[in-house]
A protein has these predicted regions:
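Alpha-helical transmembrane segments of integral membrane proteins
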Residues: 4, 38-46, 71, 107-111, ...
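Residue-level signal for alpha-helical transmembrane segments in multi-pass membrane proteins
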Residues: 15, 49-57, 75-86, 157-161, ...
Length: 255
């Protein structure tokens, strides 16, 4: 745990913040031409905004996460809902093997586990906030269980729909399989690029906000236990948030 905390601060958390901020602006470039230094400056603005939100209020940051999470679910539900009525039986029931890839055995199992594990990897992040949650003994298990069920349903539904509309080779070779799936759905096909770009922006904004919210709590908790620099245990006198930890992580992410 000690090593994980230090690695998180120096090697994983700030880079993930910067990568997500840049990803948001890259998706925005689908609508507005943004390049070079301007792109990076806009990414910095996004980080600054969420830093301010999460320093100012834990409750306000939590409410924003609820809103952005609801907005994340809606487009997935739309694609799944329309897709279920447009499944192609011959594709869904096809047993054609994937060319050039392992189709069975330990190699295929490892590849599948690696991919799906990454998709569910963020679940533990909710526990970082347990010290600031009302009635955590009840709400933490409930939140983790409901989150797992909802995410599993969305992922399974999206995978099922994609498997009934896209061939296995299309899914394997496409750089943007969700965009390809949306392009084949009636009613939204002609707007697939726009819809997927908006979906991506919403999803990454939610991820960026949550990372800025929960990641500094690792260093904050370690500092309280004298396992990290003591200054990271500072709490804002008015907002009661670990402002120093949030600010330093923001600064490292921008660099």
């Amino acid at each position: 745990a000690f090593l994980c905390g230090w690695i998180s601060f120096w090697a994983t958390d700030p880079p993930s913040i910067s990568i997500m901020a840049l990803a948001i602006v890259n998706y925005l470039a689908f609508f507005v031409p943004i390049h070079g230094l301007v792109l990076k400056l806009v990414a910095v603005v996004f980080v600054l905004i969420f830093m301010g939100v999460h320093i100012r209020s834990v409750e306000g940051g939590g409410k924003f996460q609820i809103i952005i999470t609801a907005l994340k679910i809606l487009p997935f539900a739309l694609v799944i809902g329309i897709g279920l009525f447009n499944l192609q039986g011959d594709i869904l029931l096809s047993s054609a093997p994937l060319k050039g890839y392992a189709t069975g055995g330990i190699a295929a199992l490892i590849a599948g586990v690696a991919t799906t594990t990454w998709s569910y990897d963020g679940m533990g992040a909710a526990c970082y906030m347990s010290g600031e949650i009302k009635n955590p003994k009840k709400n933490m298990p409930l939140g983790l269980i409901l989150t797992a069920v909802i995410v599993l349903a969305l992922y399974a539904g999206l995978t099922f729909v994609a498997s009934g509309i896209l061939s296995i080779d299309e899914m394997a070779t496409s750089d943007a399989p969700i965009a390809l799936l949306a392009s084949k759905l009636p009613g939204i096909g002609q707007y697939a690029g726009t819809i997927v770009a908006i979906m991506a922006i919403i999803v990454v904004i939610g991820s960026l906000s949550s990372c800025i919210m929960f990641q500094p709590r690792i260093e904050y908790a370690m500092a309280k236990d004298n396992l990290f620099f003591k200054s990271f245990a500072k709490v804002h006198p008015k907002y009661e948030t670990p402002y120093f930890s949030i600010i330093v992580q923001w600064a490292v992410a921008i660099v």
